[in-house]
Amino acid sequence: MSASSGEKSQGRRFAEQQMHKHGWTEGKGLGRRENGISEAIKVKVKCDHAGVGHNSAEQFTFHWWDHVFNKTASSISVEADQDGVKVNRTKDDDAPVTNKKPRKALSNRNMLYGRFVKSATLLPGGEQAVKEPSSSESSDSSGDEDEKLDLSSATKMTDEDLRKVCGGRTAHKGARHGLTMSAKLSRLEEQEREFLAKYGNKQQKDKVKAVTPEITEDLLGKNRQQNDSGECPETNNSHKKKKKKRERVDSEREEEEEEESQENRHEEEQVPLSEEEIKSSKKKKSKKKHREQSASPQEEQVTESTDFCIKPKKKKKKKNKSE
């Protein structure tokens, strides 16, 4: 289960996480003695119609055009005569030209009994058994015979050998003159730098913009919590004013009640009031009327001011019907 070069699937990542919990590390085998497999079993999906043992890389390794050219050249002989040059065909081989690798098994397909396996030879004195070669010898012999049938000259040459033969030249037309792809690579690097300089700052700004709304939402949430926990400052001031006003009104009412009680007592006793006492009583009555008239508009102003700071009602969360 060692890490592969490609991306790991979700199931494989989950399995590795579970094994890491139990002390497994990459490169170790499974089992108590750690002598089991160290790599995951990979499923290979067969998506073609080729048979068992088919080599899909054969189309890249087998140089069929070279094989066909050498095969046709070997079946032709050129002779020089007095009259000129004669071209004779040495072999009467009518095999079709194909891009598939030649094999011995395919050449015996049209035989009458080619599909049967020979086990013994019938003789006058009895049967003579055929010696069956071992599997390794048969595979080696079949492989050697198939290689002999392949007439392409580039089969045993690697890419490095071909490059040496060609003097280090590649398919690039200017490579034979010492030209390389350095100019094109430098242009691509310049384009990448310009792209980063042009759009790199915009991407950073977008990230900052994406972060700032989250910060503002957090601040708004904190302010809402503070407002929910405490009252508005305007309402606090209005409550204090109302309290002071009530205390003042209560004290004035007590004074008025005392004065009325004194007047009633004087009337009962029929004691004549002095001019100063009469003037003071008139002043108090006029103040009382003025206070009653000014009290009503002030109360309206207080109610209007308190309407501006009303606590928002908390929305009740709707319960899901599924619950």
Swiss-Prot record:
Biased composition (Acidic residues): 252-261
PROSITE patterns assigned to the protein according to its UniProt record, in alphabetical order: G_PATCH
UniProt biased composition (Basic and acidic residues): 9-32, 84-94
Compositional bias segments (type: Polar residues): 294-306
A Pfam family of this chain: G-patch
Domain G-patch as annotated: residue spans: 11-57
Cited InterPro entries: G_patch_dom, PINX1
Entry GO MF terms: nucleic acid binding
SMART domains attached to this UniProt entry: G_patch
Disordered: region residues: 1-32, 84-110, 124-185, 197-323
Protein name (database record): G patch domain-containing protein 4
Biased composition (Basic residues): 281-291, 311-323
Domain of life of the source: Eukaryota
